[in-house]
């Protein structure tokens, strides 16, 4: 198990927020960060601190991306026309692991990354094992036939609610999803407030 994967339960505590809206999040039990000194009095945060925090939240939400992965995504967002903050969110939501998570084929974004990396997913009928693969509008994402009876998938599908994001269409029984358009920030169902505009300020400073 990677260090980034094993540290997922510390992300909520470090941020002081329940990033994924999980009932068992440690933030639900206490409102301070990890470590024995986590309960110190809060100090006023600088503009840079707010920007850094916004970046760490967004990185953490998508499976604790590495700085290299995240900065490359930001650079691509900055090169594109339009609002860089909106572009950044659109690119993150276009990741294959993000779409697998949004389609509720697996319970967490961490599980989605592992699921893709282990070759359980196809895009337009071809197996893709790169979690950061950038899906295009019209792409059809599906769970491979031989992977459909995995306990992870069956439990996720059985326990998930049937409401899905408006930018994907999902055939829950067929374990298939179509990426119909790149979302705007306001459409992404983040359980907590994300501030990609502060991320833009972080990289611009």
From Swiss-Prot:
InterPro entries tied to this protein: Ribosomal_uS4 (IPR022801), Ribosomal_uS4_bac-type (IPR005709), Ribosomal_uS4_CS (IPR018079), Ribosomal_uS4_N (IPR001912), S4_RNA-bd (IPR002942), S4_RNA-bd_sf (IPR036986)
Keyword RNA-binding carried by entry: yes
GO molecular function: rRNA binding; structural constituent of ribosome
Stretches the record annotates as Disordered: 1-46
Domain S4 RNA-binding: start-end pairs: 94-154
Top-level division of the source organism's lineage: Bacteria
GO cellular component: small ribosomal subunit
PANTHER family noted in UniProt: 30S 40S RIBOSOMAL PROTEIN, SMALL RIBOSOMAL SUBUNIT PROTEIN US4M
Self-association and partners: Part of the 30S ribosomal subunit. Contacts protein S5. The interaction surface between S4 and S5 is involved in control of translational fidelity.
Described purpose of this protein according to its UniProt entry: One of the primary rRNA binding proteins, it binds directly to 16S rRNA where it nucleates assembly of the body of the 30S subunit.
Similarity section: Belongs to the universal ribosomal protein uS4 family.
Entry protein name: Small ribosomal subunit protein uS4
Gene name tied to this protein: rpsD
């Amino acid at each position: 198990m990677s260090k980034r994967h094993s540290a997922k339960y510390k992300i909520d505590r470090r941020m002081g927020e329940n990033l994924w809206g999980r009932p068992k999040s440690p933030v639900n039990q206490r409102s301070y960060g990890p470590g024995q000194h986590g309960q110190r009095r809060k100090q006023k945060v600088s503009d840079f601190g707010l920007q850094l925090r916004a970046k760490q939240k967004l990185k953490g939400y998508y499976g604790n991306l590495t700085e290299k992965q995240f900065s490359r995504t930001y650079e691509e967002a900055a090169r594109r026309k339009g609002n860089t903050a909106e572009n950044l969110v659109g690119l993150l939501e276009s990741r294959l692991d993000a779409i697998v998570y949004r389609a509720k084929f697996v319970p967490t974004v961490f599980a989605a990354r592992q699921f893709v990396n282990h070759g359980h997913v196809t895009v337009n009928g071809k197996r893709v094992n790169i979690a950061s693969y950038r899906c295009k509008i019209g792409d059809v994402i599906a769970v491979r036939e031989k992977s459909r009876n995995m306990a992870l998938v069956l439990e996720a599908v059985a326990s998930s609610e049937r409401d899905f994001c408006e930018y994907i269409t999902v055939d829950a029984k067929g374990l298939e999803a179509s990426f119909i358009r790149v979302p705007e920030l306001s459409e992404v169902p983040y359980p907590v407030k994300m501030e990609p505009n502060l991320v833009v300020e972080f990289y611009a400073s």
